[in-house]
Amino acid sequence: MRPFGCMELWAGNERAHRALDLAGLESDVIAVPSGGDKGGDLSAVFSCSDNTARVVLADCVGHGYTASGVARHVHHLLHRYQDIRDTAGLLAALNDAFTLSNEKTDGPLRLTTVVTGTFDGTSGEFNFAYAAHPRMLLWRERERRFLELGEGLEGFPLGYITGETYSQQSVRLNHGDMILAFSDGATEVRSVVGEQLTAKGFLGLAEKTLSGLPQPLVLQDFSRTLLEGVQLYRGQEGELEDDITLLTLRRMT
């Protein structure tokens, strides 16, 4: 087996809307930090060996300057371990290094949730693992509906305890199928009467957004319109209470 290696195509925790195509995937990332130009949500896209793509979305507790610093540290660790082939193994390595660095710093415990996935452009397999992160949504183009991904997958966030092991699952993506990863800022927004959107409400909003857009779907339009829907649910102007990042993937081959 050839050595596995990855090259970062894009990573950041700043306000952005970017699109990339790789390994038979179309990807779109839209990020809106709370209270500034940079926040605690880190998204990253890698091109790897053997027609493989890897994505990572990390959500550092808090927002603003402090969370932004933690996100930069997670980004640094990603570079150190980006060539680990196994998805769950990548999380375990990140967690051990992040937790040990926590022990060397003063101040409150820094925790970070993470979801990472690796897509094989040849087989269509998408392997994924969670570190206490909100479950991604899978859009089945043939069935025209969203499903939650990763039932039964658990795991502590990065920074809680060393030696944590993570489990991974796999799903095959067909032409037109999509993966939607997001930070918890998207599901924890509240309406003007204080009702939280919730994961179920966000899934429904994503389906409503897709049904209202013209076909063939432009992925950037979906991300932008879904974010606008989250903002409309809030029903108020001003800064978000938490950072929001949406990372969408669609199989094109």
Per-segment meaning from a language model:
Residues 196-211, 216:
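Divalent-cation-assisted or electrostatically stabilized phosphate/pyrophosphate-binding catalytic cores
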Residues 70-72, 194-197:
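Short, glycine/charged-enriched secondary-structure capping and boundary segments
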Residues 1-180, 228, 232-253:
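… and, occasionally, acidic/histidine-rich disordered N-termini of signaling adaptors
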Residues 138-141, 190-196:
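Cytochrome P450 core scaffold surrounding the K-helix E-X-X-R motif
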Residues 77, 205-209, 225, 229:
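Generic non-transmembrane alpha-helical segments
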Residues 184:
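Conserved catalytic-loop aspartate of Hanks-type protein kinases
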Residues 85-91, 211-223:
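Short, charged, surface-exposed loops that flank catalytic or proteolytic processing sites
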